[in-house]
Amino acid sequence: NFGLTENGKYYEKLNYAIGEGIEPGSTFKLIAIAAALEDQVIDTIQKVDTSGGILDFYGYKVRDSRKGGYGKINVMDAIRLSSNTGVVKIIDSVYNKKSKKFVDRLYNFGIAKPVISSIKGEPKPKIPHPDDESWNGLSLPWMTYGYGVKMTPIQILTFYNSIANEGE
């Protein structure tokens, strides 16, 4: 990514793929579902009701992009359709009282560590933990679809590559 100098010349300012953490949003849904599958607390054909496309958590809404939601769908469709309500309901149903187990699984996946040690400037991912002072009732549902989390694009890509390469 290039910046522009006062003289009108371009220079490489920052490699955003490794240099800046972002909230991964919907790309984190697969990571959340992978944690539940790995913990064997769900299976891919399990059904979830998307609740008309809106869920309420402590007065805050989780919404699907599709008005009215998707009805009853299975876990695979929740990922395929990128259903916020579906994925949040699935994860909340199995980890609501065990959020530490969920986050520990994420840490076990290695996503809380930088991936490219040979390149300077890669920030450490921010994966909230129930022991953090800032953890609250919204932390788990928001994390489920990538909010409150910070990862660089290369860190997200590395996780997806491990799935594509069957865990390697």
Model-derived features: positions:
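Beta-lactam-recognizing serine transpeptidase/beta-lactamase-like catalytic domain environment
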Residues: 1-25, 31-168
